């Protein structure tokens, strides 16, 4: 009998695994690794202007009220897709400070000319230095920064229409 | 049009899989020694199916080669500006294409088995083909219902959207297909094991049929893992050669099971022992292949290897896994008790050593499996953990160290029963080498424990691996024995590389101004300059490093930080300087505010031996296959000649002589 029971052991182990894996498949997967920087103050930075039309960006510019920090680039296709949503946020009275990654002034101006300019300031990050310092690995990404300069929320990827209320709520929470 | 031909071929192949399954099952209804009339369709069904599945894959290959942007798969994974070679490799660099490749290889090996294997009893063969058809059917269903590679777009896309740049590499051309072919070889082993279990024909003849498939799969897995390790080493730019990443583990686990299976099959073929154990490992090896596919494709685990994942497809694969593996283990539990026990043997014997090492391999497999699935388990309770080298290295070493020692001694033992006293010289030599090398190395400095043990074991194993050749005429040693000797020696070589990398690597991370020099080991590395460069679909900054060994002539290394567009992603291209005794590994990082560049350089002594060892191990496997097959062919020819002579003598009316054995 002992030997017979041993023969069932692989099946029992497998059933346990299958049950666990099945359960995990039904769980909503948190697709993004949250930045360690959530709850941390912004690192100190001062970036030069990305083109002639707007001033550059620095940490001090986030003082006063909650703002959005949008990391983007003129060469990034999803950034075109998210441009209307940024315009919508701006229309709701949200101040958006941009950081353009590895970009050229002429391209930035061209992009803003074609797809609209929702930004109050744009800093030029030619070597992704600030981008990496705030825990972002791609474009576009958007951060909610409160009045004290603390990172409160991170949105990875382009902002879809359905993401706008969530961002507004996070800005509200950051008051 | 070609896409429609491919799709039609797939549907037809699926229909033939049903025929193969049903017809094969009828073979079981035949009385022993007879053939059921309905069972005769299984073999042709498998052969035609192989042609159809290969045709479907060829059609997809054509669509990628010509960048047919009306296909959804091509539009979302390729790009007209990609070099042709990467267009072709892009065929299987995505979910649907890789599953089609899997199915194609599966059908091809089913066809080969059905077409050429005549040694098994028809009942076992029928049952095997039925199982093979059943397995294939599940994957056809998966392809056709949940991941159709031939789906057309309503409107052709103007341009494709690229390929993961990390995977845009010649390594990708070889690595996944090799692993897949290995996995599929294990599926044939699985079908054969189930066939033999259903007919209770688990015997040496069955083992001889099983062996080439297991060996072949094992060689391919060995090569696949070796190539994958080297790919991760130079492409990820982190300086490591094994990260215990879920995707890497997914390829390691079937290899461990296949290694155990291969040795177990040899015992069954030579000594008619370990019957149940062989069947069990046959099921286990394929389970691990499917589990690997599930883990990689479902996205339940996070990995550095970015695959497109989809929980629904994960559910489908999990369903297949439950059906095949759950079913197989159920049949195993019900049937294995009825398989007659094999021959017995003493604890100290060749079989004893093989069983011990099979248990050790299984234990390592359990360690890796647990470590890989543990994050899944804790995540069920909302705890995110990452299991890494601090767990895997010591936990697997606990079992790997005794295994390597027994591996040194095992091939020297006799079958059935042996006395340790007979091997006094060999045992003393092995012990002296282990202790001597460890003492010698410790004398020169403080090194971590595991690499130190690894060096001692590598030296002992390298010598012990050659001992089976001692006192024999090298010309008369069978090819298969050469295979074993070379494979075991290859393990020693790889172990030596791993231990050296662990013990003696030097690392230097420095911020350098252009023109500045850093010293690492014997090498002086000068940053001559940093320039932007552009490729077909990327731009990069490239550092020009002049490397001088002991003040000699400079060698130029050009590590790059690349930025791809479509999709935008940045990668780090390492630059390697290979010497006979190691590699210099250089990566360029960010530029600091003051204009200095981060340069990261490693000197890794003998690191290349890891992969040389892997290639030797695979070569040993190939020799073993060649040896076994040539013996089989000679035996078959001799039998045929004997039959011919007897027939001739019969025709002449003379009395047939008794054939000499």
Can you describe what each PLM-predicted range is?
Chain A
Residues 1-48, 175:
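N-terminal targeting signals for export/organelle localization
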Residues 27-28, 48-55, 122-125:
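Short gly/ser/thr-rich secondary-structure transition/capping motifs
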Residues 45-67:
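A short beta-strand-turn-helix
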Residues 113-118, 125-175:
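Thiol/disulfide oxidoreductase modules built on the thioredoxin-like
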Residues 80-116, 126-132:
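Structural microenvironment flanking redox-active thiols in thiol-disulfide oxidoreductases
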Residues 68-69, 96:
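Hydrophobic beta-strand anchors of alpha/beta hydrolase catalytic cores
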Residues 70-75:
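Aromatic-flanked redox-active Cys/Sec active sites in thiol-based oxidoreductases
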């Amino acid at each position: 009998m002992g030997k017979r029971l041993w023969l069932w052991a692989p099946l029992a182990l497998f059933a346990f695994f299958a049950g666990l894996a099945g359960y995990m498949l039904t769980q909503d997967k948190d697709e993004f690794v949250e930045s360690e920087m959530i709850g941390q103050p912004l690192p100190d930075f001062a970036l030069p202007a990305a083109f002639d039309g707007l001033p550059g960006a620095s940490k001090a510019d986030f003082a006063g009220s909650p703002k959005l920090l949008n990391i983007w680039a003129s060469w990034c296709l999803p950034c075109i897709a998210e441009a209307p949503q940024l315009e919508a946020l701006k229309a709701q009275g949200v101040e958006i400070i941009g950081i353009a990654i590895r970009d050229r002034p002429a391209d930035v101006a061209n992009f803003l000319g074609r797809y609209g300019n929702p930004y109050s300031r744009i800093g030029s990050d030619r070597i992704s230095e600030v981008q990496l310092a705030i825990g972002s690995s791609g474009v576009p990404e958007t951060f909610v920064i409160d009045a004290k300069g603390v990172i409160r929320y991170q949105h990875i990827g382009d902002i879809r229409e359905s993401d706008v209320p969530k961002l507004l709520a996070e800005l509200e929470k950051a008051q | 049009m070609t896409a429609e031909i491919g799709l039609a071929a797939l549907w037809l192949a699926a229909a033939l899989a049903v025929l193969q399954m049903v017809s094969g099952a009828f073979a079981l209804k035949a009385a022993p020694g007879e053939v059921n009339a309905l069972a005769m369709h299984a073999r042709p069904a498998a052969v035609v199916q192989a042609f159809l599945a290969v045709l479907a894959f060829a059609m997809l290959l054509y669509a990628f080669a010509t960048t047919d942007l009306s296909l959804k798969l091509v539009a979302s994974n390729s790009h007209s500006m990609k070099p042709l070679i990467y267009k072709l490799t892009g065929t299987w660099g995505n979910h649907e294409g890789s599953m089609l490749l899997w199915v194609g290889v599966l059908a091809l090996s089913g066809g080969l088995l059905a077409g050429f294997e005549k040694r098994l009893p028809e009942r076992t063969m029928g049952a095997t083909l039925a199982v093979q058809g059943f397995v294939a059917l599940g994957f056809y269903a998966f392809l056709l219902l949940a991941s159709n590679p031939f789906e057309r777009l309503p409107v052709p896309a103007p341009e494709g959207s690229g390929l993961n740049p990390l995977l845009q590499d010649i390594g990708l051309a070889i690595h996944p297909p090799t692993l897949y072919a290995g996995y599929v070889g294990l599926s044939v082993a699985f079908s054969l094991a189930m066939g033999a279990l259903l007919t209770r024909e688990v015997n040496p003849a069955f083992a001889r049929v099983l062996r080439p498939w297991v060996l072949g799969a094992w060689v391919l897995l060995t090569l696949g893992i070796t190539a994958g390790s080297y790919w991760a080493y130079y492409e990820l730019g982190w300086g490591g050669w094994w990260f215990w990443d879920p995707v890497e583990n997914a390829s390691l686990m079937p290899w461990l099971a296949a290694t155990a299976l291969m040795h177990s099959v040899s015992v069954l073929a030579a000594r008619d022992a370990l019957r149940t154990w062989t069947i069990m490992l046959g099921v286990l090896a394929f389970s691990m292949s499917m589990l690997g596919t599930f883990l990689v494709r479902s996205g339940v685990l996070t990995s550095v290897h970015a695959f497109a994942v989809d929980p629904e497809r994960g559910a489908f694969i999990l369903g297949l896994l439950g059906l095949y593996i759950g079913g197989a283990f159920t049949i195993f539990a019900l049937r294995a008790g009825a398989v007659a026990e094999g021959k017995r043997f003493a604890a100290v014997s060749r079989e004893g050593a093989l069983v011990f090492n099979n248990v050790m391999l299984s234990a390592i497999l359990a360690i890796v499996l647990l470590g890989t699935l543990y994050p899944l388990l804790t995540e069920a309770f909302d705890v995110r953990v990452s299991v890494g080298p601090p767990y895997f290295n010591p936990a697997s070493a606990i079992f790997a160290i005794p295994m390597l020692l027994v591996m040194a001694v095992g091939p020297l033992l006799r079958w059935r029963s042996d006395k340790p006293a007979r091997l006094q010289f060999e045992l003393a030599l092995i012990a002296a080498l282990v202790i001597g090398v460890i003492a010698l190395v410790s004398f020169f400095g403080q090194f971590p424990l595991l690499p130190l043990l690894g060096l001692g074991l590598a030296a002992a194993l390298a010598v012990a691996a050659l001992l089976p050749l001692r006192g024999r005429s090298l010309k008369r040693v069978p090819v298969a024995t050469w295979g074993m000797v070379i494979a075991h020696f290859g393990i020693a070589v790889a172990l030596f590389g791993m231990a050296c990398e662990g013990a003696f690597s030097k690392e230097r991370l420095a911020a350098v101004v252009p023109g500045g020099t850093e010293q690492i080991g014997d090498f002086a590395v000068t940053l001559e300059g940093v320039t932007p460069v552009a490729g077909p679909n990327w731009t990069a900054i490239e550092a020009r490093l002049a490397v001088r060994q002991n003040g000699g002539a400079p060698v130029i290394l050009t590590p790059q930080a690349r930025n791809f567009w479509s999709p935008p992603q940045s990668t780090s291209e390492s630059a390697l300087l290979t010497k006979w005794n190691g590699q210099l590994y250089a990566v360029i990082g960010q530029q600091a505010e003051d204009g200095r560049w981060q340069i990261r350089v490693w000197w890794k002594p003998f690191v290349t031996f890891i992969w040389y060892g892997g290639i030797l191990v695979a070569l040993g496997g190939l020799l073993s296959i060649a040896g076994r097959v040539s013996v089989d062919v000679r035996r078959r020819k001799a039998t045929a000649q004997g039959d011919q002579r007897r027939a001739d003598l019969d025709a002449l009316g003379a009395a047939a002589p008794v054939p000499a054995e």
